[in-house]
Amino acid sequence: MRGPKAPKDPTKKRPSIYLMLDKNIAGIPDNYGNCRDTNFMEGRLLQQIKGICDEIDDDILKLLEHMDGFTKLVHSIGVSITAQKDEEKDSFITFTMQCYGKADKYGSGTQVTAKCPCNGEEVMIPVDEMNINENDDIIGAFHFDFPENCQGACVTLRFYLNDGYSVPEIEVDPPIDYESNAYDEMIERSLLNLGNVKRLKKAIEKAKRGEKVVVAYIGGSITQGAGAKPIHEMSYAYLSYRGFCERFTDNDGANVTFVKAGVGGTPSELGMVRYDKDVTNFGEIKPDVVIVEFAVNDEGDETEGVSYESLVRKIAKADNEPAIILNFAVFMNEWNLESRLVPVGENYNLPMVSVKQAVVPQFGKNTVITKRQFFYDIFHPSNDGHRVMADCLIHLFEEADAAEMPEEDSDFTRQPAIGADFEDVVLLDRANFEEFATISTRGFEGSDKEIQYVERDLNNFPSPEFENHWAKTENVTDAEFVMTLTCKNIVLVSKDSGSPQFGKADVYVDDKLALTADPLVNGWNHCNPQIILNERESKEHTVKIVMHPGEEEKLFTILGFGVTL
């Protein structure tokens, strides 16, 4: 191959801001059969940039808060994608920058797309060739659409700046030495409390004997596997499960079942409601070990820890006495809710692992893994971060195996540390309501096809959460849902949405307004639990749900209820 006789001088590179740097992406099928990797940027964009380069001036970053500032600052977008497998490097992935609109958040924004080769070649998208207009508000998301023949890739995405703007060059991170003493010391710091390991040792001994063992995980998006690529093979849950199998079985874990029940953006308030369905399948599955991870999801928990402790006690009360491990993840800003949740673990002397205690001290000095390496975005760990989280749990497994067998089990009947109002909560939905309640559903006979989907267990494809729901039928203006039952507390689980088709609903308990549920407050499609009744004694109550005045034609989806009878 011969080159040009007179090659042009290289074009001088403009200063650039990195949005993604050598980040793993993967094409996971959605419920429509498309393979897409989505990175949401609303409320995260500036922190994500700071996570890659903390020295960028705040005045420059503020220009990226809205699209008018973006067009002023940014000259072009550069996207380079490299397939992980050589045979996939002839493929193309379609990149999309989705702008959220001012009027219709998801429907009116501009979408900037480019077809990118998977051979590492950088594709440039000039801003002056984009159709960005006054209706565009913010950068909402980056999407990567995969062809069938390409499953995993690595992407670098950056904004090249217009003349007159400059930002610092970033330094390349050194590789992570997973075999170093410093790495081992970091992992050892994660063991917040070995605790009473009687139940955990019993599960380990069962596994060693070749008996059937179930290792289950319940939590938020990190447990679901967010940031892990591919999600079903690189999540901390799967990696630590594999670590359990490799250490305590001689058949590669053939006798150990993996249950993964992480749901993005949801707290323990929802976890306690869905535990029976998502983890135990209403008693058909009996977990021997349950890892609970809500330390970065419970900020919005209206019970401030009562739901979390209720979930712990609910799990512990099972006839087969499962071991419970409390797992505390951390955000890029070094925050979690350990200070609230650790007292629950201390109350029952539970094994506890703190990823925060492991990684945060070394971010500043004696660094083993940088923030840029550990985090996929401001909330979720990367593949490296998931590996660290898994190694923290595996270290606990090993320490428990080496420890003496305690004579006594933990006492889960003792006075709660925070509260346990919901420890006997059960799920009530369209599939089982006749066991508990009398319900009339005028106008709520529909089925919502756009509910939250999550990847469960060993699957790399999503399946619906709360599929047995009640959805308001379109064009019905007098919809009324009425439920009568005997209970002492009720948690309403409804669907949040970003669609303007959805409207507020008024929720009455015994003819008193308990709350007005607004599905647009959080602005995205997920499950939202809200307490509408919490009393000490069980008695008959009637729940009525109607659309808020002025919004009778809009949609609303009741996903289910958590009730204590």
State what each model feature region is:
Residues M1-Y217, T223-P230, T249-A254, R387, ...:
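N-terminal secretory targeting modules
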Residues G78, C99-G101, G120-V127, A323-F328, ...:
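Extracellular serine-dependent O-acyl
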Residues G195-I204, Y238-F244, S268-G283, G305-K314, ...:
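Alpha-helical scaffolding within the catalytic cores
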Residues V214-I218, T223, T257-G262, D288-E293, ...:
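Structural recognition of the beta-strand scaffold that forms the well-ordered cores
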Residues A216, Q224, A228, S268-G305:
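Oxyanion-hole/transition-state-stabilizing segment in secreted/luminal serine hydrolases
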Residues S221-Q224, V263-S268, A295-D301, P322, ...:
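Solvent-exposed loop/turn segments at secondary-structure junctions
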Residues Y238-V256:
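Signal peptide-proximal N-terminal region
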Residues E293-N297, S307-P343:
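Active-site segments of SGNH/GDSL-like serine hydrolases
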